[in-house]
Amino acid sequence: MRVFSFALSIFAATMFGAVAALAQSPGASAPAFTLTDTAGKSVQLADFRGKYVVLEWTNPECPFVRKHYTSGNMQGLQKEWAAHDVVWLSINSTHAGNLEYKTPAEMAKWMEAQGGAATATLIDGTSATGRAYAARATPHMFVIDPTGTVRYNGAIDDRRTANPADAKVARNYVRAALTEAMAGKPVSVESTSPYGCSIKY
């Protein structure tokens, strides 16, 4: 009986992962969520219907995240696309019970120190939103169009290293997806494998 229960739990976990992965595939509707930002304000994805939205999974403890902030790459993208009325939501899905968890105040302080320019920094302390999107790494990026459809899911760029210098010469998939989608063109690269640190669920 114990073996059966274990096997059933493995099957359920596998099926949940498969359903979550399907839910955030390019062409699918982006899963709805409501999270709290670092100022304590409730933020829903639905608040931004009619706009392009970028989701950035982040964790200050991750060297791959620090690569993009140390180089100024992430802040530069945030500012670049804010000028085009794109909403940028940075999400920390590190579980509240994990040693790497950051309180809202700690996340706000870190983002301010980096010069972050996201529309909002959101705390997903239960990891529910991260799991709904099957987010696997920090950074893991999603581009959602004004209809709520996922247009891109994956790595931020094609330089899979933690070296800040690489960010300046990389092919940036997020910029490419936004540029093409906002011009009414098909997104040429809709999905890639994200690289970085595992999300601490």
Model-identified regions with their sequence ranges:
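Boundary at the C-terminal end of the N-terminal hydrophobic targeting segment
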Residues: 20-23
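Bacterial N-terminal signal peptides
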Residues: 7-18
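Short, internal strand/loop/helix patches
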Residues: 105-151
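A short beta-strand-turn-helix
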Residues: 33-53
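Conserved helix-turn-beta segment immediately C-terminal to the redox Cys motif
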Residues: 51-52, 67-91
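Short active-site neighborhood of thiol/selenol oxidoreductases, capturing the structured segment around
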Residues: 46-66, 88, 178
